[in-house]
């Protein structure tokens, strides 16, 4: 199954929801999203060997919350959604969508928020980014979107991505179209922007028991059935790993067919789990999966591969 985003004026009366309707897409709800992430990161930092790193990520997430409201985005995406639908492409495709300088403004504001909180190497990194030319920023953004991580140092990447993510999340939250599921391929990528997931989550509430993958860029969530590899869609050789026991709130779902894994979070086990924060706080599980011979099929926005990785 792939998910296409259909413009409002192309939705017919047949689109009415039934009792068993499963929302294929959950567009980002930005109110308090970054504050919740920052709070969860700070909570998970307690008694965690990665505590300093989690608190560092919390500072960035909190800055994102501030900058989000300081620099709102107003844009009409109706024409873009129609064009993308006609082409069968994600409306905010990271590989083709022209980037507005709005994200440069977001980056500079993030840096201004973070400078008083940073010291040492981290401060040097953001001061270096503050002086970067527009061309240099665009080159780094293009390299990250092309997964050419050797061209962007792993200490700069989280700050660049934080600004890009804010920009894409702002756009995604403004999409006036609705989504419907259609058969196709490439459901391992976000149907809104084409980026990859950070984790998947089995939810509670109105989407009780349903699994959604969470985009590491635009914060959209999209439905993928459980007991299926989110990377290759095979079902025959899946296994679930955890650091605790079978009731753990965070597990890794591995696939023997494609040799990858993606973490799966369970809100019914812990309602406070957060896609980015809980992934970052369980890097020990990633190390274990690597020892077992599996490759991660996702990237956390605070942890990018460095040169040679």
Curated annotation (Swiss-Prot):
Q: What is its main location?
A: cytoplasm
One Gene Ontology term of the biological-process aspect is: protein maturation
Annotated Gene Ontology MF terms? ferric iron binding
Pfam family for this entry, one: FdhE_central
Q: Which GO terms describe its cellular component?
A: cytosol
* InterPro entries given in the database record: FdhE-like_sf, FdhE_C, FdhE_central, FdhE_N, Formate_DH_accessory
| Location(s), subcellular | Cytoplasm
Keywords, comma-separated and alphabetical: Cytoplasm
The record's comment on protein family reads: Belongs to the FdhE family.
Note the HAMAP family from the entry.
FdeH
Summarize the protein's role: Necessary for formate dehydrogenase activity.
What PANTHER family is this protein classified in? Answer: PROTEIN FDHE
According to UniProt, the name of this protein is: Protein FdhE homolog
What does the record give as the organism's lineage? Bacteria, Pseudomonadati, Pseudomonadota, Gammaproteobacteria, Enterobacterales
Gene encoding this chain?
fdhE
